[in-house]
Amino acid sequence: MVFVYKPVKKQPHRDKPQGRKVEVVKQGDRYVLLRNGEPYFIKGGAGYEHYGRLSKYGGNSIRVWHTDNAQQVLDSAQKYGLTVTLGLWMAREREGFNYYDKELVAQQTEHLKEIVLKYKDHPALLMWGVGNELYAESSNVKVWDAVNQVAQMIKEVDPDHPTTTTVMNVPEKEVSLIVKKCPALDVLSINAFGSMHNLPEDLARSDWKGPYIISEFGARGYWEAFYTWWMAPIEQTSSEKAEFARQRYEQSVLADLKHCLGSYVFMWGNKQEVTPTWFSLMSEQGEETALVSEMRRFWGDTVVINQPPYIAYLKLDNKFAFDQIYLRPEQNFEATVFAYDPEQDSLQLHWEVLPEAARQDGNADKQKKPAVVQQTLLKQDGNRQWLRTPAKEGPYRLYVYIRDGQNNLATANVPFYVTHNPLK
């Protein structure tokens, strides 16, 4: 394999902005992130859109995973007074990269050096994210030597911005290797969802004793969810996600201010990952779910917020998702959603049936929402919807989207399996 990259175009010197000095210091028994000498606690969102809203709601930072469109991202962040943790994408071995190949690793480091030199003086830059969950599906410990090589390179060409790398939860072996092999890293970033509430204790038992950032959190991950018998993960309602994330934010971020430098909620925007709603804090049209309201409160927004609708539960054929819903093809069934609006706003319900997504891979960018299955929806009456199951056997989901006319949205879905031979 040959690592090929395009030379990075340098900014004209006359347009070169003035950067900001960012550093991590220890004050007494507490780690503090300083930006131009002032304490800077990260109140962020991970994503590529709605930066103006994030700033308006009290957020101060965004996180992205790679440098595609980095100039646009940094400029947009600067426009709204936000900072950026800018990801430097490092290839993974499962993608064919070999970290035993010293020449290949050197090429990658040189490529990343060009990127660092291009963006290091941008005033919106907060820190560098060196790779993302690099150990996933790989056991080659040489990857951490490469991470340290990149981090050390950054310290030489850009001493004004800290470096971090990202792991999922607190994998004991990998964290130990990071401590031993990556002394040039300043901060550990952790993507945590279901186990986020245990982070302070897990980190205390690990070899990492320095500062950390929660680089992704939000709904329970689909890899942590309960599954149907046909291996479809059961998704929380948007109301459940907000409460789930609120509890974990309080139990980790707010409970460990001596080590935690802040967090990035995931996903600030909309993303198809298993479903179009699993991690999306907003709809494709920008309507906001309950987790946005929770983050506004944590970020200190004092504006009185019109709350999104609340979904208590969704049933299909009088069954919950946990009841393993098998339905015969081309038969009529009834679905019911139980919901209310805190301000008693009038609610509009939209239903749709989608086939189960073929991929359950968060690392696959730009996944497309499956096409809506046509001719499945029959009569709707208030909170009830009748549907006709598809003729084709296989896994599907019934979705409901509830709007209050105030740019708020509540979502829920229930997986079901169409078959001529139901198991129950």
Listing of model-derived features with the role each one plays in the protein:
Residues 23, 27, 35-39, 44, ...:
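Substrate-binding clefts and catalytic carboxylate motifs of secreted carbohydrate-active enzymes
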Residues 169, 173-223, 227-230:
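Aromatic- and acid-rich polysaccharide-binding/catalytic face
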Residues 383-387:
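Short strand-edge motifs at loop-to-beta-strand transitions and within beta-strands
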Residues 1-21:
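Bacterial Sec-dependent signal peptides at the C-terminal "C-region" and cleavage site
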Residues 28, 34, 38-185, 198, ...:
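Active-site mouth of glycoside hydrolases
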Residues 418-424:
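Extracellular interdomain linker/stem segments of modular secreted and single-pass surface proteins
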Residues 388-392:
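Residue-level recognition of secondary-structure-to-loop junctions
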